[in-house]
Design a protein with these regions (language model features):
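His/Asp/Glu-rich metal-coordinating catalytic cores
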Residues: 1-5, 11-195, 201-208
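Short edge beta-strand segments in beta-sheet-rich domains
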Residues: 210-212
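Ligand-binding beta-strand-loop-alpha-helix segment within the catalytic cores
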Residues: 234
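Short, surface-exposed, charge-dense and proline/glycine-enriched linear segments
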Residues: 50-58, 214-223
Length: 234
């Protein structure tokens, strides 16, 4: 989600004080992701400035796009919306969020525009997920639009069947445990980590490995995101 929402605090820094409409789950995730983004920027700017000072270079000071205060303040402008509800955001403009099945909170957006008695419907697809994913629902279907703005990063690919992720994980776990090792899995904090936790739980519940093992998630952001997943899918 951060590639879609990460610059919203910069709008706030530049004076934007309007409402930000998003699905409720996306709004929840933004409360932690935007602060994390600000923290990373502030840390990197500080590191670059220290490095430039040590090199005795008179470069322009590195400044983050926004700080944590801006990330917190802009959240007050968020309006959480539910899937399927038609919302009038201004005279002659209505929107509806449809589950895109990509990540928790992801959505395609239907926009109805009416002016001088003429009505048009515009659809922005957003990132569209695949079907039969373990946590999020399948993408919703749209039946009509006058104009479509479509995300198409993988539009030229032919997708086969869904891989058996649990089977592959079991192979890796068994091979590593048999050698006396530990399994370390780097993963995106939002989305992928939660899917991995789901797969690992299924492995343990169904006793697909003939030994018990502990699971540690070493990421404050992933822990906060997981709690938001639990809140929104339970």
């Amino acid at each position: 989600h951060i590639d879609h929402s990460g610059l919203i605090p910069l709008l706030y820094v530049n004076g934007f004080r309007g409402q930000v409409f998003a699905t409720s789950a996306t709004a929840d995730l933004c409360t932690v992701m935007l602060k994390d983004s600000a923290h990373i920027q502030m840390f990197e700017a500080e590191w670059r400035n220290r490095k430039a000072k040590r090199a005795d270079r008179t470069l322009k000071e590195f400044v983050p796009l926004y700080d944590i205060e801006a990330a917190i303040n802009v959240m007050k402008q968020f309006v959480g919306c539910e899937y399927g509800s038609i919302i009038e955001i201004a005279d002659g403009i209505k929107i509806r969020f449809i589950d895109a099945g990509h990540l928790l909170g992801s959505a395609s957006i239907e926009v109805w525009l009416e002016e001088n008695g003429v009505s048009k419907k515009l659809v922005f697809s957003g990132d569209i997920g695949n079907i039969n994913k373990p946590i999020v629902k399948d993408p919703g279907y749209l039946t009509y639009a006058d104009y479509v703005i479509m995300e198409s990063t993988y539009g030229d690919r032919s997708h086969g069947g869904t891989p058996d992720y649990i089977k592959e994980l079991v192979k890796v776990f068994k091979r590593t445990f048999d050698r006396g090792g530990n399994v370390v899995i780097p993963s995106f904090a939002v989305g992928r980590t939660q899917e991995l936790l789901y797969f690992i739980r299924k492995i343990k519940e169904n006793r697909l490995i003939d030994r018990d093992f502990d699971v540690y998630m070493d990421s404050p952001l992933a822990i906060e995101a997981t709690n938001i997943f639990i809140k929104n899918i339970s």
